[in-house]
Swiss-Prot record:
It is an enzyme of class 3 (hydrolase). PANTHER family: UREASE (PTHR33569:SF1). InterPro entries: Urease_gamma (IPR012010), Urease_gamma/gamma-beta_su (IPR002026), Urease_gamma_sf (IPR036463), Urease_subunit (IPR050069). One of its GO terms (molecular function) is nickel cation binding. Belongs to the urease gamma subunit family. One of its GO terms (biological process) is urea catabolic process. It comes from Paraburkholderia phytofirmans (strain DSM 17436 / LMG 22146 / PsJN). This is Urease subunit gamma.
Amino acid sequence: MKLTPREKDKLLIFTAALLAERRRARGLKLNYPEAIAFITAALMEAARDGKTVAEVMHYGTTLLTRNDVMEGVPEMIPDIQVEATFPDGTKLVTVHHPIP
């Protein structure tokens, strides 16, 4: 299988997000890379599902709480940016303070 660098990045994000979902389901608090992957994958899927940029940006602030992540992680993530594929093309989505 030949993948572009962008496709490899998406696959890596998805794999890390899957691991984060499983750990969260077991009641473990997510660390920094797990939280980033979890939120990023959810944003990419929401865009693919046809939500607007504004809806995806708002959705990104509802995915995790401080109780879902290790201490200090929310402060390490002031914003998340992801190039997501929407029905009308690829757009940059920025979510400020994704873990309120």
